[in-house]
């Protein structure tokens, strides 16, 4: 988990009446709106808990580029969740 993971947790938990199934469905909708690279990086890092080093070997890109993609993905997901709460 990276420094932006808390942003998603806080966004999902901000509404006391937001149930887990609804939160998970909304998160999946938000992820589906991401460009392919951001979606892949987000899923590998957030859900599969892979390190950037491992992802960089798989995707053959720099760790810096991956961190930027992950950051953008988190910001887009957070914005999506805020619009749909």
Per-segment meaning from a language model:
Residues 27, 65, 72-73:
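Short intrinsically disordered, low-complexity segments
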Residues 2-40, 50, 54-57:
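Amphipathic alpha-helical segment used for protein-protein interaction
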Residues 41-45:
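A short pre-motif secondary-structure segment
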Residues 51, 60-65:
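Helix-turn-helix DNA-binding motif, specifically the short coil turn and the N-cap/start of the second
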Residues 1-6, 57-60, 71-85:
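C-terminal edge and immediately downstream basic/flexible tail or linker adjoining helix-turn-helix-like DNA-binding
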Residues 31-32, 46, 78:
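Short, locally clustered residues in the helix-turn-helix/winged-helix DNA-binding domain
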